[in-house]
UniProtKB/Swiss-Prot annotation:
Residues 1-103 are annotated as: Interaction with EPHA2. It comes from Chlorocebus aethiops (Green monkey). The gene is CLDN4. The chain crosses the membrane at residues 10-30, 82-102, 118-138, 161-181. Residues 31-81, 139-160 are extracellular. Its main location: other. Disulfide bonds join C54-C64. Residues 208-209 are annotated as: Interactions with TJP1, TJP2 and TJP3. This is Claudin-4. GO terms for cellular component: bicellular tight junction; chloride channel complex; plasma membrane. Channel-forming tight junction protein that mediates paracellular chloride transport in the kidney. Plays a critical role in the paracellular reabsorption of filtered chloride in the kidney collecting ducts. Claudins play a major role in tight junction-specific obliteration of the intercellular space, through calcium-independent cell-adhesion activity.
Amino acid sequence: MASMGLQVTGIALAVLGWLAVMLCCALPMWRVTAFIGSNIVTSQTIWEGLWMNCVVQSTGQMQCKVYDSLLALPQDLQAARALVIISIIVAALGVLLSVVGGKCTNCLEDESAKAKTMIVAGVVFLLAGLLVIVPVSWTAHNIIQDFYNPLVASGQKREMGASLYVGWAASGLLLLGGGLLCCNCPPRTDKPYSAKYSAARSAAASNYV
């Protein structure tokens, strides 16, 4: 049986990863484009996220606009939005299961059922981590591919935003926390030893006349 400290550590890491996924989803910094004109005053930075894009001027002014339609996003960001939302929901289910199966809670009385619930929670967190790392890595791959593509204009080339690094950190926390929770082994049920006795044969009766 894994110690309570290991279980608490796994839950804490997974919850931090869950919060980081929500931050990754909310921040409009998946892709960053920098336009620098002849005058530094005219320079601006464009942030592209899953829900909106923002234009940051060199003066510090920032204007954000929510996407009018889902079709306004590129295909990789459309898929990323769906997968990240699913990851948040799956991780929330993992948090609920970890609370139910926690050693310090009384939702379940059976220790074996608690351990099995924590294992399921760990698997759910692992799934949530995979659902995050796939869209983040896919978006980063497309950004790097376009950056080194000579056919793409320099003004259209983008760089990786902070949301991608937050997403990688979130997936790492979820995978690590889920892995620790999967170390919960159900306690062995010691079956009482039942000794079987064979009926002793009585000694041969004396012969009666």
